[in-house]
Amino acid sequence: MMTDPIADMLTRIRNAVRVERPFVDIPASRVKRGLADVLKREGFIWDWKEEKLEEEPVGYLRLELKYGPNGERVIQSIRRISKPGRRLYSRSKELKPVLGGLGIRIISTSKGVISDREARRDKIGGEVLCEVS
């Protein structure tokens, strides 16, 4: 049994980027779709789509990873912040830019999963899921 599916998703992305895979497959869920959507909006991945295999009860998200023109990684680091054993919540005023605005934090809010920039703009706080740079 998996205790932290979001950490599993982030680890799969981190491992795929390290070996320069063009895509990564991840078991689907609503929160993971939200994470993938934020990563696409913020320019860390090219695209994502959901695929369903006939023999599998759960669909998969296929994330198309993004690399620079010379093969450099767009995602330099991706790490889990709030964990099942230690949840971390933050108000919008407490959300400071990551690496001077070069990175993002992904927040789970009452409005769905959004980036820290959107949370500051809309003045919404929530659970800080992860940090990407």
UniProtKB/Swiss-Prot annotation:
Xref: Pfam families: Ribosomal_S8
Xref: InterPro entries: Ribosomal_uS8, Ribosomal_uS8_CS, Ribosomal_uS8_sf
Alphabetized GO MF terms: rRNA binding; structural constituent of ribosome
Listed GO CC annotations: cytosolic small ribosomal subunit
The keyword Nucleus is assigned to this record: no
Superkingdom of source: Bacteria
SUPFAM superfamilies named in the record: Ribosomal protein S8
GO biological process, one term: translation
Entry keyword set: Ribonucleoprotein, Ribosomal protein, RNA-binding, rRNA-binding
Subunit and partners: Part of the 30S ribosomal subunit. Contacts proteins S5 and S12.
Family: Belongs to the universal ribosomal protein uS8 family.
Function comment: One of the primary rRNA binding proteins, it binds directly to 16S rRNA central domain where it helps coordinate assembly of the platform of the 30S subunit.
Name of the featured protein: Small ribosomal subunit protein uS8
Organism annotation: Rhodopirellula baltica (strain DSM 10527 / NCIMB 13988 / SH1)
